[in-house]
Each structure stands twice: as C-alpha cells, then as structure tokens.
C-alpha cells in the first residue's frame, strides 16, 4: 500500500511539474512560480530539469523564459540550477559528438540564455566557444556543426561576454 501511495504521489508530482512547465510563457511566469515552488522540488528535481530541457527544445523561442525560470529557482535551490546545467552540458556534448546540428544549436542557445541569466558563469561560455573552435587538438579545422553552434551561441550571449570578459572574447580564434 505504501509503495502504491509513493507511486501515485510521484505521478502527481510529475504531472504537476510537466503541467506548470508546459504553461510557462512571458505573461504568466510570475503567477506560475508560486505553484511550482508549492511542489516538492527537492524530490522532483530531476523531473523539473528534464521537463525544462524538453520544453526548451520543443519551443526554442521560449529559451529566455525558461532560463529566467531556472534563474529564479536557482536563487532558492542552487543545487537544482547546477543539476540542470550539468544535464544541458552532457546532452550538448552528446549532440556535438553525433554532429546533430539542430540539437546542439538549441542546447547552445539555452546555455547562452543560462549565462545571460547568471545561472552559469561567463567563463563556461568562453570555454565552450574555444572547445567548439579548437576541435580537440588535431590539426583539422572545426566541423561545420561546431562553427554553426558557436555562431548561434555567440549571437545569443556575445553581448554579455563582451561586457564582462572582453579579453576572453578576443582569444576566440578567427576561422577563415
């Protein structure tokens, strides 16, 4: 009986998290955050991260809204922001290895928005660009996927990087 109760409460938590994340937009973010914090986010931290990444990939134009949501949650539960960042980076690395331009570009955009919202440090952004453009130590030029991903990433957070770490941005190699 206790196992059935746990399973039922887990399903309720999953439905609650997914329902709230899927409703998030510019107009109702402030109204949905108290609902989200009313849920057991410690227990459902993995669910929340998975739901946010999935929703962001389905609607990339809402990336800044999801990043703002994560930034607000990160102020109360920093471990959750760290978990989401780790998951985004793992998925991004997998997408780059598979040369999946659509996924890597979408995740790079989300990473850029997380940097813009101060969930991730700008040095991570600079390291990411250098990783993309230096192509793992061999003498071959970076792949087209890496160049496209770096361009979309810089488009999204280049302004902040130039303001906060201009010397780091000038270290980015010029391709051509």
List the predicted regions and their residue ranges.
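Helix-loop junctions that connect tandem helical modules in alpha-solenoid scaffolds
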Residues: 2, 51-58, 91-100, 132-142
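Extended alpha-helical scaffolding segments
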Residues: 122-176
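Hydrophobic core segments within long, regular secondary-structure runs in both alpha-
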Residues: 49, 70, 82-93, 108-111, ...
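Flexible helix-coil junctions and inter-repeat linker/turn elements that act as hinges
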Residues: 37-42, 58-62, 73-83, 94-101, ...
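Amphipathic alpha-helical elements of HEAT/ARM-like alpha-solenoid repeat scaffolds that form extended
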Residues: 27-35, 61-74, 102-114, 127, ...
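Long, low-complexity, highly charged intrinsically disordered regions
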Residues: 1-68, 72-86
